[in-house]
Curated annotation (Swiss-Prot):
Residues 1-11 have a biased composition (Polar residues). Residues 14-77 form the bZIP domain. One of its GO terms (biological process) is response to osmotic stress. Disruption phenotype: Reduced requirement for exogenous sugar for seedling growth and higher rates of true leaf development. This is Basic leucine zipper 1. Pfam families: bZIP_2. Expressed in both shoots, including young leaves, stipulae and trichomes (except in cotyledons and hypocotyl), and roots, including vascular tissues (e.g. in both the phloem and the xylem). Present in seeds and pollen. Restricted to vasculatures and roots in the presence of sucrose or glucose. It comes from Arabidopsis thaliana. It is found in: Nucleus. Residues 16-37 are annotated as: Basic motif. PANTHER family: BASIC LEUCINE ZIPPER 1, BZIP TRANSCRIPTION FACTOR 44.
Length: 145
């Protein structure tokens, strides 16, 4: 009987070993599947992030180009503003000089109300085009960058 118990108990041990081995294999298989899924998810996430990086880089490049364009246009407009300010200042100086000259000369080309033959009244001199020597003050052509 002791032999029968050993045999029975030996086969129980073998059965337990076999079940444990099978359980370990199944656990290892689940672990491998879990690891594989994690790897696939990570690869998918990397791919997605790389795509987003590429899109953001392209967007950044487009914004940089637009910024450069706007900065160039802004520099041109600032230059044109300086030129126009100088032009207006020169025109104001010419008007002041011309007004002063007319005042000092007693009216210049304008005639007073008593000279009816000329047909020009006082004050009409401001409506007549002056031929001043200001060749350097030509209007600036449209400025494009």
């Amino acid at each position: 009987m002791a032999n029968a118990e050993k045999t029975s108990s030996g086969s129980d041990i073998d059965e337990k070993k076999r079940k444990r081995k099978l359980s370990n294999r199944e656990s290892a298989r689940r672990s491998r599947l879990k690891k594989q899924k994690l790897m696939e998810d990570t690869i998918h996430e990397i791919s997605s992030l790389e795509r987003r990086i590429k899109e953001n880089s392209e967007r950044c490049r487009a914004v940089k180009q637009r910024l450069d364009s706007v900065e160039t246009e802004n520099a041109g407009l600032r230059s044109e503003k300086i030129w126009l300010s100088s032009y207006v200042s020169d025109l104001e100086n010419m008007i002041a000089t011309t007004s002063l000259t007319l005042t000092q000369s007693g009216g210049g080309d304008c005639v007073d109300d008593q000279n009816a033959n000329a047909g020009i009244a006082v004050g009409d001199c401001r409506r007549t085009p002056w031929k001043l020597s200001c060749g350097s003050l030509q209007p600036m052509a449209s400025f494009k960058t």
